[in-house]
């Protein structure tokens, strides 16, 4: 049985969040939480929140034991990009792309 949590439209670049997601994929839930607590990346706080939600979904919706859960899948998809103008010299302008992410974490029971 698997439980899933998704955070959508998070205002951080998918590339930055993938660096954090790669650290926890396949790990046990408690180990993943410990890794996220000490990871000095901005995305680690958001990923920790999604992981906590996935564990809560597993406990509440499927009556699974949190100590027996593992991060079976974790991935980041690109959300819509906000395009903003940044003024430059001589009347020119550059486009600033403010990227968003959709973060998905799926937890399942350990296979013996």
From Swiss-Prot:
InterPro entries: Ribosomal_uL22, Ribosomal_uL22_bac/chlpt-type, Ribosomal_uL22_bac/org-type, Ribosomal_uL22_CS, Ribosomal_uL22_sf. One of its GO terms (cellular component) is cytosolic large ribosomal subunit. This is Large ribosomal subunit protein uL22. Part of the 50S ribosomal subunit. This protein binds specifically to 23S rRNA; its binding is stimulated by other ribosomal proteins, e.g. L4, L17, and L20. It is important during the early stages of 50S assembly. It makes multiple contacts with different domains of the 23S rRNA in the assembled 50S subunit and ribosome. The globular domain of the protein is located near the polypeptide exit tunnel on the outside of the subunit, while an extended beta-hairpin is found that lines the wall of the exit tunnel in the center of the 70S ribosome. Pfam families: Ribosomal_L22. Keywords: Ribonucleoprotein, Ribosomal protein, RNA-binding, rRNA-binding. Belongs to the universal ribosomal protein uL22 family. The lineage of its organism: Bacteria, Bacillati, Bacillota, Clostridia, Moorellales. One of its GO terms (biological process) is translation. One of its GO terms (molecular function) is structural constituent of ribosome. Coiled coil: none annotated. The gene is rplV. PANTHER family: CHLOROPLAST 50S RIBOSOMAL PROTEIN L22-RELATED (PTHR13501), LARGE RIBOSOMAL SUBUNIT PROTEIN UL22M (PTHR13501:SF8).
